[in-house]
């Protein structure tokens, strides 16, 4: 049976910190495409206080999360236990995008989420999986692009969402 929490206490924050990745879900206000994105590694997600989390938003192929947050602020962070006892935790809230001063290092922004609802559920449908390691492609891609290439990439490919909503501007 699921439980609704008043805040993210130390025990829940510890559980969050032991997961390998998290997912964020957003949607535009009217029509458009719902977006669910895997994020990680987990050390990019920080519990700021009992009602606030934030994560580092890396340069990537899409900009839906940022565009949707700029439009309406709605976001849900979901974490699943792929190891140990089954559990899913969802953090529903309002997010804001704090742009990085320079995406040349591979970071576009910090996404800060003011959590309005904290709940868990059984997680029985989540498979047990063994963590092997982080994929090496991201670091290789960043090195290949270089700082100027990353700035160009954000300017050219992250300016708007697939639905044409504004996301990042340089």
Feature locations, PLM:
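Binding-site signature for planar aromatic cofactors or substrates
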Residues: 1-170
